[in-house]
Amino acid sequence: MTQYFDGKLRKATLLLTTVMALTAAGYAGAHEETAGEKTLLAHNADFQKQIVEVAKGVYVAVGYSAANVTLIQGKDGAIIVDTSANPVDAKAIIEAFGSRMVRPVQAIIYTHNHPDHSGGATVFAGNDKPEIISHRLLVTAKPDTGRGKREGGDAFGTSLPDDQFINAGTQLEYGRKTPHTREGFLPPTQTFDGDSKNLTLSGVKMELLHTPGESDENTAVWLPEQKVLLAGDNFLKTFPNIAPLRGLPTRKIDEWIASLDKIIALNAEHLIPGHMQPVSGAANVKAALTAYRDGIKSVWDQTMAGIAKGMTPDELVQTVKLPPELAKNPYLQEYYGSVAFTVRGIYAQQAGWFDGNATHIYPLTEKDRATRLLAMTGGQANMLKSAEKALSSGDLQWAAEQADYVLAVEPHHSEARKIKADALTELGERQDNATARNYYLTAAQYLKKNP
């Protein structure tokens, strides 16, 4: 596997990694870096710009956009797998590919419908009129639900100032510098149904495998002669985002596990994920995929066993953990997805919204509960005094919750908003999960800007 670091010598790697870390660490002068921030800053090394020759005639562009783009050279043209987030990034990737980017582009394959993988197709297609290939479910995929206009951007840190943003978990930036509007998307001209489809494109034999998981339509691309597997977003160098903060349904874990079983059986020698660095060496690929499957399955099995015992979501979050050997695995660090989020998502998906406590069938409204608690504790001033004490002692969650009692009754109470914003800021700074960090910090920013 050959690496070309943005067209420069290998020694540029260290310089680039350092620059990326310093760029993201603009906040360092304001406070001492937390352990979580140090972890996320180190994770930035996984996004450095480079063109990697995975196998003969197979190149992947890492770090030039939110998602990877793979170039497969054929006998009379090229096949592109995923197309980056937008035309701006796509043009930069074509330039980085340089002479390796052969024309015409005979086909473009989408692994799934997410904008960061499908937004630059028009640039790669140019005037070549390639076949655009995907699973049929990509065509019928519904837009993400979300909870409002800000939701996706909040988890990705889209509106955070530079001195607070580090990364978005699977990418160095999402929509901060270049758009994620799918403006360069081209609809499929050819789809397949069922479990798989064998193709020969520009003389390259390949098999498209329907591997639902991160998305229902996720398609793995298997190159049997080169022993190269492109997994889409079913495998990443982070615990998977099974139950996203940004307002999406919990992913179908049983299908995800089955899809990983399917691709493990291929015995690939090279593995290209949808984001970050490829993995090479048959033993390394098998170990990485197996650990990924086992990590997901462990959380699933533990959660389902707990549900069967009548445990509540809060109880499950306290008890369900990755086994020690998996918790240390580099492909299961919680930069993007979270074990705790996954546990709550599985519970809601499999057992519904009700936690089994009869008191929670028809609970008081937040405002009603807060009004009674404030009366019981002597009013808003006493509650805020207690919240300030919690904040100063580092009991950040309790500080934020007490501020919420006041805000439930008086949403624009300036002191309560400040206490909550300060608590959320510190909570965010301590996170090594990028989506949690970004959401905390964005919520704090919103409280400060909208008193």
Region annotations inferred by a language model:
Residues 1-28:
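Gram-negative bacterial Sec-dependent N-terminal signal peptides
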Residues 19, 29-41, 265-270, 278-451:
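Accessory terminal helices/loops
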Residues 38, 53, 77-78, 85-87, 140-309:
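Metallo-beta-lactamase
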Residues 46, 51, 75-77, 87-134, ...:
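Active-site metal-binding motif and surrounding structural segment of the metallo-beta-lactamase
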Residues 48-99, 220-223, 227-233:
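Conserved beta-strand hairpin/beta-sheet module of binuclear metal-dependent hydrolase folds
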Residues 57, 72, 82, 97, ...:
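Divalent metal-coordination and catalytic microenvironments
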Residues 72, 120-121, 142-147, 232, ...:
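Short, solvent-exposed loop/turn and secondary-structure capping segments
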